[in-house]
UniProtKB/Swiss-Prot annotation:
It comes from Rhodobacter capsulatus (strain ATCC BAA-309 / NBRC 16581 / SB1003). Pfam families: CxxCxxCC (PF03692). Belongs to the UPF0260 family. This is UPF0260 protein RCAP_rcc02083. It comes from the Bacteria.
Amino acid sequence: MSSNLRPLFWTLPLTRLTPAEWEALCDGCGKCCLNKLEYEDTGELEFTRVACRLLDGESCRCRNYEIRHQFVPECVRLTPKSLKKSVYWMPATCAYRLRYEGRPLEPWHYLISGDPETVHDAGQSVRGWTVSEAEVPEEDWQDYIIEDL
């Protein structure tokens, strides 16, 4: 872990985190990079196995994180201020959502376990089961809906 991170920073209110601490809060699951279907009439939201074309399916990280908006302008910019608008679609296990809701991080989170592989070992990441949006037309995404995320 980077030396510019305060001990137990993840227990602080999100608004008190430094930019480096904010970024370090991500558990690396990759679930936020899954495309979602949102039904306007019901507001229902369904995750699909169809991932952003920039997601590395093995590492579950963005291939071009720093400049991702040049390639995917609609990619969400999560900040402490924007989180309120986005938290409803974030996975229940997401560290940002958990902390926003005042809950602790999961035991498999690397900040708790000390190992960035535990998110994958615990089966909490998208490693190995996504398909790139470059390979699936949007009209077929409903064929890739995930029943239980």
